[in-house]
Curated annotation (Swiss-Prot):
Entry cofactors: [4Fe-4S] cluster
The protein's name: Dual-specificity RNA methyltransferase RlmN
Lineage: Bacteria, Pseudomonadati, Pseudomonadota, Alphaproteobacteria, Hyphomicrobiales
A biological process from GO: rRNA base methylation
Pfam hit, one: Radical_SAM
Length: 399
C-alpha cells in the first residue's frame, strides 16, 4: 500500500511555553454557571437568565468565536463581555489528514501552572458515508497503563476541564465549517457522533466529562443526541451506574480479555475491579436494552486473546447483557510487542459470536498512517523519533 498522508503543521512549536489568558473562556459553562459569571460582572439579576440563554445560543449553536458576532446582544453588553471573558477553544497546533480521510488535531491547552510548558491532547475525526464520528480525549495522558495502548505509555499529567472537552467538539466544527447558520439552521452536520475514546479514562474525570457531555447533547446548543454519544471506560466500576444516571449516554466497555489473569496484564485496572464486578455493573446500567445495547470493545491480539475458546467464554460472560461486540484489529505502534490477529482468525472469532446471537462487527482501522487509530493516540509532547516514524511508515505499508 502506498502511504499518502497529507500533513499540515501550523507555524508553531508544540513545546513552547503557553501563557494562560488573563480572561477566562466561557466555553464549558452550563446555563446556571453562565448566569453566575454574568452576575460577577454586574449584570442585573433580572437579566441573567435571558442573557445566559443568548450566550448559550451563540456559543454552542452558532459557534461564534468573538462576542462582536453576537448581534442579538447590545453593543454595550458585548464590549463588557469581551473585557472580562473569551469564547476561546483549545489551540490547534497541528492537523494531519490520513489517506482515508481521517483527521487528527493536536490541541494545546493551558498548563494551569505559571511557567510550565503547554499541555496537549489529540482529537480525531473519522468521516464515514452515514456519519461523522469525533473521538474526544478526557485527560492529558493516562493512568491505566494498558499494555497494548500507545496512550498508556504517556504518564497522566492532568484531567481536562469541561471546557477543554467541549472545546474539542467545537474545534472540529470550526475546522470542518460545521456550524449552523441562518441558511442551514437545521441542516445536516458533519460531526454526528461523539465517542469518549481518546486519551484518558473518562470515568476518572467524572464531573468534567458529565458536565461536558450534557452540554454537547443539549438540543438547544451543539445538539448531538445522547444516543449518538458513547462513553468508553476500561471499567471504573463505581462510576458506571452513576454515568447512566447522571449522563445517560451510550456505554462502551474496553474488555479485551475474558479471563482475569490475562485482563490483569492487558488492562491493569482489572486487578482493582475484576470481570465479575465489571459485568455486574453493566447489568445494572440504567437504560440498557436491546435498543440501547452496551458495546464491548475487544482488541484482537495474535495468539493472546483470539482463540475460539476465548470467543466461547466471551459469549458465556455476556449472557443476560444487551450487548454488541466490536472486534478491533490491533493497530501497531513503534515499540509494541503485540501483533494483530490473522484476518482468518478474526473472521472465525466474529462468526462464532454472531452465530451465538450477538452483533460482532470488525472495526475498520482508520488513520493508522497518522497514529490516529484506536489505541494509537499520544500527545506530541513526547515526540516520535525519526526511527519510530520510519517504523510506523513500514507498518502502514505492510497492511
Amino acid at each position: 500500500m502506498t502511504l499518502s498522508t497529507s500533513q499540515s503543521l501550523l507555524e508553531k512549536t508544540a513545546l513552547e511555553t503557553y501563557v494562560p489568558p488573563a480572561r477566562p473562556s466561557l466555553i464549558g459553562l452550563s446555563r446556571a454557571e453562565l448566569a453566575e459569571a454574568l452576575g460577577g460582572i454586574g449584570v442585573a439579576a433580572s437579566q441573567r437568565k435571558m442573557r445566559a440563554q443568548q450566550l448559550w445560543h451563540w456559543m454552542y449553536f452558532r459557534g461564534v468565536q468573538e462576542f462582536a458576532e453576537m448581534t442579538s446582544i447590545s453593543k454595550e453588553m458585548r464590549s463588557q463581555l469581551a473585557e472580562h471573558f473569551t469564547v476561546a477553544r483549545p489551540e490547534v497546533v497541528a492537523e494531519q489528514i490520513s489517506n482515508d480521510g481521517t483527521r487528527k488535531w493536536l490541541l494545546r491547552l493551558p498548563s494551569g501552572v505559571s511557567g510550565e510548558k503547554a499541555h496537549e491532547v489529540e482529537c480525531v475525526y473519522i468521516p464515514e458515508t452515514d456519519r461523522g464520528t469525533l473521538c474526544v480525549s478526557s485527560q492529558v495522558g493516562c493512568t491505566l497503563n494498558c499494555s497494548f495502548c500507545h496512550t498508556g505509555t504517556q504518564k497522566l499529567v492532568r484531567n481536562l476541564t469541561a471546557g477543554e472537552i467541549v472545546g474539542q467538539v467545537m474545534v472540529a466544527r470550526d475546522r470542518l465549517n460545521d456550524w449552523a447558520d441562518r441558511e442551514t439552521p437545521n441542516g445536516n452536520r458533519l460531526v454526528t457522533n461523539v465517542v469518549m475514546m481518546g486519551m484518558g479514562e473518562p470515568l476518572y474525570n467524572f464531573d468534567a466529562v458529565r458536565d461536558a457531555l450534557l452540554i454537547v447533547s443539549d438540543n438547544e446548543g451543539i445538539g448531538i443526541s445522547r444516543r449518538r454519544v458513547t462513553l468508553s471506560t476500561s471499567g471504573v466500576v463505581p462510576n458506571i451506574v452513576r454515568a447512566g444516571e447522571e449522563i445517560g449516554v451510550m456505554l462502551a466497555i474496553s474488555l479485551h480479555a475474558v479471563r482475569d489473569e490475562l485482563r490483569d496484564e492487558l488492562v491493569p485496572l482489572n486487578r482493582k475491579y475484576p470481570l465479575a464486578e465489571l459485568l455486574q455493573a453493566c447489568r445494572d446500567y440504567p437504560g440498557a436494552s436491546n435498543a440501547r445495547r452496551i458495546t464491548f470493545e475487544y482488541v484482537m491480539l495474535k495468539d493472546v486473546n483470539d482463540s475460539l475458546d476465548d470467543a466461547k467464554l466471551l459469549v458465556k460472560l455476556l449472557s443476560g447483557i444487551p450487548a454488541k461486540i466490536n472486534l478491533i484489529p490491533f493497530n501497531p505502534w513503534p515499540g509494541t510487542a503485540y501483533k494483530c490477529s490473522d484476518w482468518d482468525q478474526i473472521e472465525k472469532f466474529s462468526e462464532y459470536i454472531f452465530n451465538a446471537g450477538y452483533s460482532s462487527p470488525v472495526r475498520t482501522p482508520r488513520g493508522r498512517d497518522i497514529l490516529a487509530a484506536c489505541g494509537q493516540l499520544k500527545s506530541e509532547t513526547e515526540k516520535l523519533t525519526a526511527r519510530e516514524r520510519e517504523a510506523l511508515r513500514a507498518m502502514a505499508m505492510t497492511d
